[in-house]
């Protein structure tokens, strides 16, 4: 038996087809008497807010997609290993402020986005007429990811007790360090909870299929 078309089913029931993970995050990470925020760092960053009486989840902006595209353009590498290139640069505050004006970031949730918006063409439009160093742009893109996540937290408007991070972005050491500095609550990879950060979404698909078959 093959179970598929999860995103289409979500849209048929009034959703946006993404993110699909919040219900699974609840199964994995909800803790008694604690509010837990789960950050998934794929190409796009999404957050799930878990408390005893609610589950909130939506996309908040780019995670790795812009950084991966930029390092491929300038260093012919598929990703910035450990965030080392970003760590060699400095945040360009005027550029960061400009990127944060993107209207999507200020829409209320639930919402979803993707590479159809956050891509190198979008970035190039913001860089037109500037002459910033490539490594400084990479560092600014990393900070932009963190600021998008912080803005998402602010929009939820609740105090969080624990931050759990999953997805490929957990391997970006500079990104994880910057995230940890951004929040007062402890911020850890899902690996600390016995969940491989690289396989959360793959396991999600198996979990949804099992739930579907069980009725």
Residue ranges and their predicted role:
Residues 130, 150-161:
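Phosphate/pyrophosphate-binding loops at sites that engage ATP/ADP/AMP, CoA/4′-phosphopantetheine
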Residues 143, 188-215:
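Glycine-rich phosphate-binding/hydrolytic loop that grips phosphoryl groups
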Residues 6-78:
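Phosphate-binding/catalytic loop of phosphoryl-transfer enzymes
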Residues 56-146, 150, 212:
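Conserved ATP-utilizing enzyme core subdomain
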Residues 160-180:
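Glycine-rich phosphate-binding loops at beta-strand->alpha-helix junctions
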Residues 25-30, 143-154, 210:
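Generic structural signal for well-ordered alpha-helical scaffold segments
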Residues 137, 152-156, 179, 189, ...:
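Non-transmembrane, aqueous-exposed alpha-helical and coiled segments at domain scale
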């Amino acid at each position: 038996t093959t179970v598929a078309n999860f995103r289409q089913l979500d849209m048929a029931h009034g959703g946006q087809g993404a993110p699909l993970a919040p219900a699974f995050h609840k199964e994995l990470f909800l803790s008694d008497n604690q509010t837990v925020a789960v950050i998934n760092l794929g190409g796009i960053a999404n957050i799930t807010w878990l408390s005893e009486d609610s589950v909130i989840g939506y996309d908040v902006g780019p995670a790795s997609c812009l950084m991966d595209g930029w390092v491929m353009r300038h260093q012919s590498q598929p990703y910035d290993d450990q965030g080392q290139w970003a760590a060699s640069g400095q945040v360009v505050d005027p550029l960061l402020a400009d990127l944060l004006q993107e209207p999507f970031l200020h829409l209320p949730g639930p919402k979803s986005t993707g590479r159809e918006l956050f891509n190198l063409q979008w970035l190039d439009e913001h860089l037109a007429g500037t002459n910033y160093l490539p490594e400084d742009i990479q560092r600014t893109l990393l900070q932009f990811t963190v600021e998008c996540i912080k803005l998402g937290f602010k929009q939820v408007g609740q105090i969080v007790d624990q931050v759990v991070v999953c997805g490929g972005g957990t391997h970006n050491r500079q990104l994880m360090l910057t995230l940890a500095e951004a929040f007062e609550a402890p911020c850890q990879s899902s690996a600390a909870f016995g969940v491989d950060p690289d396989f959360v979404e793959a396991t999600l698909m198996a979990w949804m299929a099992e739930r579907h078959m069980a009725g």
